[in-house]
């Protein structure tokens, strides 16, 4: 029943905005860097209702930070970082300060080989993070607090959505009998990678809050939007609200003189279980408006811990770029 409900909701382009509470913001002190870390609580709606969540503006703690260069679109070099060859291949990603990122497919002592293209530059500042996994984000022993179950039908379901293929990547749940994350075929799934721009869908068995921890995302964020009417589930990648009018989507989406002429941003209401607001970029007035042509205000935000739906009616995939809505000073 849960799976059928999920398909029905996604077929209606459903997405649920969640509230997030930052319960702590601490200063950790490794040998060479000071990292802001956070703990967030995100409510899950029970009774088989569906919620989309983000990773709460948190990432796996960086393992390296420094200057470098991008001599080709698929390589990044640094000056004598003394990396262990192969240490980051398939398990880590690199992120530039502007938000551009790529998974790492190989590395030598001073060069990273990249899975996807980065902009060529003689000088960049970058970080290396572990790719987030289900075990890493939610805990190998379910420290996040999902409702577990003996099988797929008895607990909360975590569903992965891939905008590039417009389909599910799989259904996961915490098996409380074997005490591990599993997929629909009961295979171990705790190592499943959760990419930074990947939508997360939760179908709640009971109403509760999950609790996640991580390093606070401080840099810009970049992701890809599907075209030709495709649905992209775009997270708020920060621990603060992001105003619709300041989110930077006008650089990636096509605006129009009316709502019907443009690409759309859709905000979900968890109480109504339906879309409550629809936005488009009005090219005549150069501003974001809702479907009733009211200008977007400071109160129209993507709340922390949530995601929104983007429907790009125009042709071709596009890259969206969002700046952090705050400044962190070490």
Task: Mark where each language-model region is.
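Bacterial N-terminal signal peptides
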Residues: 14-24
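Autoprocessing Asn-cyclization modules and mimics
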Residues: 33-124, 129-133
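Long, low-hydrophobicity ectodomains and other hydrophilic envelope-associated domains
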Residues: 52-63, 68-70, 153, 161, ...
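Surface-exposed interaction/gating patches
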Residues: 136-155, 160-165, 218-276
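Charged, amphipathic alpha-helical scaffolding segments
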Residues: 172-216, 276-326
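Extended, beta-strand-rich, solvent-exposed assembly scaffolds of outer structural proteins
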Residues: 75-117, 167-190, 274-299
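Boundary/junction segments of secreted and surface-exposed precursor proteins
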Residues: 27-65, 211-224, 319-330
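Bacterial N-terminal signal peptides that target proteins for export
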Residues: 2-15
């Amino acid at each position: 029943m849960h799976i059928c409900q999920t398909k029905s909701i996604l077929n209606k382009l459903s997405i649920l905005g969640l509230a997030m509470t930052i319960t702590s913001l601490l200063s950790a002190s490794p040998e060479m860097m000071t990292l802001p870390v956070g703990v967030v609580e995100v409510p899950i709606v029970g009774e088989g209702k569906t919620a989309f969540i983000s990773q709460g503006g948190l990432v796996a703690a960086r393992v390296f930070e420094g200057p470098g260069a991008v001599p080709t679109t698929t390589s990044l070099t640094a000056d004598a970082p003394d990396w262990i060859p192969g240490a980051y291949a398939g398990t880590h990603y690199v992120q530039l300060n502007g938000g551009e990122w790529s998974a790492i497919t190989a590395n030598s002592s001073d060069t990273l080989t990249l899975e996807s293209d980065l902009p060529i530059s003689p000088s960049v500042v970058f970080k290396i993070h572990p790719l987030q996994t289900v075990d890493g984000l939610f805990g190998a022993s379910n420290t996040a607090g999902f409702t577990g179950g003996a099988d797929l039908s008895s607990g909360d379901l975590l569903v992965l959505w891939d905008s590039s293929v417009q389909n599910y990547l799989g259904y996961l749940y915490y098996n409380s009998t074997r005490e591990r994350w599993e997929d629909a075929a009961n295979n171990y799934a705790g190592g499943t990678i959760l990419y930074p721009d990947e939508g997360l869908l939760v179908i709640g068995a009971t109403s509760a809050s999950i609790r996640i921890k991580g390093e606070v995302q401080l840099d810009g964020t970049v992701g890809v939007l599907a075209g030709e009417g495709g649905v992209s589930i775009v997270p708020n990648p920060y621990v603060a609200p992001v105003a619709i009018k300041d989110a930077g989507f006008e650089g990636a989406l096509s605006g129009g003189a009316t709502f019907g002429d443009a690409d759309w941003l859709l905000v979900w209401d968890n109480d109504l279980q339906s879309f409550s607001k629809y936005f488009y970029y009005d090219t005549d007035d150069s501003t974001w408006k809702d479907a009733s042509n009211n200008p977007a205000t400071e109160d129209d935000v993507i709340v922390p811990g949530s995601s929104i739906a983007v429907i790009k009616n125009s042709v071709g995939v596009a890259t969206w770029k969002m700046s952090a809505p705050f400044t962190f000073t070490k």
